[in-house]
Each structure stands twice: as structure tokens, then as C-alpha cells.
């Protein structure tokens, strides 16, 4: 009996890993162009900005670099987000199981508080994968024109490791965790809440939801993720596009980074690039969740 239970838990974990990876690929291809615009707007100079807004950044990027410019740094999240989403869905599933076992009613489904707690725990695991992936991606995305320091994502990772070692690779980890822990609590909480609402409205089980309904719930999760934690993402991106060599950095740590952003730009500085990010959050996360759920159903 114990062996069967272990086999069942292992299969659930494997499904989360495979389905999460598939969802991650869909999320990258759908959302990366707007992510590039977001990072460029977040990290451009305050005194001499290159772009006046989202559309200006889009036009100039395509004009100067072609459509390929929108996919700069895509290799890092394509590999990294596949791994990250595998970790995310696995950690979320295992966290739900753990919280359920520790609850007063282990045989009952988790309430919203339990689901958001599971999302927060998953955010801790994700942060350690997310930090280096976002670092390589962001360093690549801010390169413009032909004057590129890095030839490829692999070259970027190699140079950062050579100059900064482990600390260099995990530059911005603190800010990543500050973002990822509450963000994933909101992300999964909103997704589960919306999914349950749509199922109860039509008097069906969540497994009977249509692809469009799953996409709607995924989009709601994405909006929740970014709306509440975007300022932390600005700090993270600013730190991760700073110099890798410690003596050349503008910011000592995330507190110093946040205080300098506020001093130079006010509250508005924490919302640079929010428009493309908000637009991206719906289709990218809709694609992620529908592919995850459908892949899981096929494997079942």
C-alpha cells in the first residue's frame, strides 16, 4: 500500500515537471517580445532616455534590429523557464500536499489561504532558478545595435561566471525572492480562485473546463502576479543590468537600488515598462496554464 502511494506521488511529480516544462515553452514564445520592451524601458537612462514609451520602443527595436531584436536573450528563458516552470509546478504541487497534511482537515481541499501559502513556498524554490535565468536574459536584452558585449546567451553566462563567479551568476537574487514569493502566492491564488469560480458557474468540475476558460484563469493569475509585485521587478531588472564587476556597480544592494530609483524618479520610477508587462501577462500566462493543464490531462 505504501509502495503504491509512493508510486502515485512520483507520477504526480513527473506530470508536474513535464507539463510545467511544456507550459514554460509556450509562455516564452508568447511573451518574450513584450518582455524585451519591458526590460529596455525599465533600465534606460533617466536623463537621456532612448524610448518615449512602449510603442516607440517597439518601433525602434524593429527598425534597428529587426523582429529578431524582440527575441534577444530568448535562449536563456527558453531553457530556463522550462526548468523554472517545472520547478514551479512541482514545488506548488508538493507544497499543497504538505500544507494539506499539516492542516486540521487533511481530507478537505485547501482554501484560498492554503493555496496562496503553497504559492509562496513555491516562490522560494523558483527564485533560485529564476535569478540566473533572468540575469542572462536581461543582460542580453539591453544590448542594442551591433555593439554587443555578449555573442550569445551561453557567452553571456560564461563571461559572467568568469568575472563574478557564483555571486555574479546570482546577482539580484534578493530582489528576485522579494518579487517571487508574494508574486507566486498571488499568481496561484488568483488562478485557482478564477478556475473554481468558472467551474462552479457552469456546474462542472475543474477538469471539464474548456481551453478558453483555463486561459481566462491563467490570464487572471498573470495580471495578479505583476500588478502587485511590479516595483520589486523594476529593482530586480535594474540590479541585473548593472555591471557584473562589483567595483563598477552603481548599486550596493536592493535597498540602495530602490532608494536611488525613488530619489531620481519618484514612485513613477517603480512602474517603468508596466504597460508592455501588463499586456504580456494575459496571453503569456494563458498559454502557460492551458498547455500545462492539457499536457497533464493527456498524461492522465
Curated annotation (Swiss-Prot):
Protein name in UniProt: Mitochondrial substrate carrier family protein G
Start-end of each Solcar repeat: 11-98, 110-197, 209-298
Record localization: Mitochondrion inner membrane
UniProt family annotation: Belongs to the mitochondrial carrier (TC 2.A.29) family.
Transmembrane segments: 10-30, 73-93, 116-136, 169-190, 212-232, 273-292
Major site of localization recorded for this protein: mitochondrion
Membrane topology per record: Multi-pass membrane protein
One Gene Ontology term, aspect cellular component: mitochondrial inner membrane
Description of what induces expression: Up-regulated by phagocytic stimuli.
GO molecular function list: transmembrane transporter activity
Residues in the Mitochondrial intermembrane compartment per record: 1-9, 94-115, 191-211, 293-300
Keywords: Membrane, Mitochondrion, Mitochondrion inner membrane, Repeat, Transmembrane, Transmembrane helix, Transport
Side of membrane Mitochondrial matrix, spans: 31-72, 137-168, 233-272
InterPro entries: Mitochondrial_Carrier, Mitochondrial_sb/sol_carrier, Mt_carrier_dom_sf
